[in-house]
UniProtKB/Swiss-Prot annotation:
HAMAP family: ATP_synth_beta_bact. The gene is atpD. Its EC number is 7.1.2.2. Produces ATP from ADP in the presence of a proton gradient across the membrane. The catalytic sites are hosted primarily by the beta subunits. This is ATP synthase subunit beta. CDD domains: ATP-synt_F1_beta_C, ATP-synt_F1_beta_N, F1-ATPase_beta_CD. GO terms for molecular function: ATP binding; ATP hydrolysis activity; proton-transporting ATP synthase activity, rotational mechanism. The keyword Phosphoprotein does not apply. It is a peripheral membrane protein.
Amino acid sequence: MKKGRVSQVLGPVVDVRFEDGHLPEIYNAIKVTHKAQNENEVDIDLTLEVALHLGDDSVRTIAMASTDGVTRGMEAIDLGEPISVPVGNVTLGRVFNVLGENIDLDEPLPADAAKDPIHREAPKFDQLSTEVEILETGIKVVDLLAPYIKGGKIGLFGGAGVGKTVLIQELINNIAQEHGGISVFAGVGERTREGNDLYYEMKDSGVIGKTAMVFGQMNEPPGARMRVALTGLTMAEHFRDKEGQDVLFFIDNIFRFTQAGSEVSALLGRMPSAVGYQPTLATEMGQLQERITSTNVGSVTSIQAIYVPADDYTDPAPATTFAHLDATTNLERKLSEMGIYPAVDPLASTSRALSPEIVGEEHYEVARSVQQILQRYKELQDIIAMLGMDELSDEDKLVVSRARRVQFFLSQNFHVAEQFTGQKGSYVPVKETVKGFKEILEGKYDHLPEDAFRLVGRIEEVVEKAKEMGVEV
């Protein structure tokens, strides 16, 4: 291992000079350690990542933690490889930082735990799976109208308090229970409190044992926030490539990844591009997203929360992300206010998998009919608000009646919310979902009260609920 000395410290940017003509490769990890000599000093154990070659045997690096206490002349050791993080079953149920160090107050990982570097090539063309396979989630509104693809990328849009976290938890639970799948959660630029809450909620709901969690919180330097998504992805890739698993990979929030990249770019002195973003925005996004894919062995399916600055979808950060997405799930506050959970907007959510060749003719026809009837209901709402239901034609009254049943039937109880609602969660297979909506659209349940359709799973549960309400079925 070659040694050098710190020559300059500029916040999260540290320059290191090496001797004997040695120059570490780009992305190599460099370690700076220093034992405090007196009470005015602090112990330093800092990892840097090489970002630029400056010439004269010097490199410019980005710090993965605070550089407080680092001074010129401190010894820096080139580790000769990129940052490496633990992978495999030892990561399940644990919480890590960007360097793969556990931060959950449990026992440290065994010293001989397998490790992989966070920088690697995307899978080669001949390793990619060309089959388009639907990932059944058991959540009706998702499976029917915006189905997820195994190895695909899904954008999850939603404000505060509309149910993003609960939807993420339910997806983790359903994949674990029904498919025996593993999940990796990467909190990128997250609020520490939210990450903490998520950890304890997952512990309480029992899904933590199938999940690895990685956090680079909001208060950490941009280097940590930019690399933490790669740390999580490396853990997910191991389960895909070495164990043939179908892995679910959550990133919250992908915008913070871009934001951290922008900060690093400015610190390295690069000329900013449009709206102040880094000129390498598309490259950085591509390097991350291209590694998230299906191979002949397994798949990594990613669900990414996306913050849209000032609701401007043409902003370079969300616009660059959209190019990579296969499906979008939009959460709508109005639906959560109506008590419809999950509050997924059935008209704004999209998926490239919703075509007859992929989901089948029947599923496609039912999904399109559901969207048409909900769209017509939306158009009629202004008339209803002004003139009331009585002014509608008989045909439109029937549309409204069925649309409301459809809207309520798109809701369902979640397993992870059982302790709050007191009602059992439901996992609904796609076939049952399609059958239920088809029968509602055909008018088979026009005689049942609307409330019987609210927060249930299969269509049979609607009939049972109606019986409990004293309605003759």
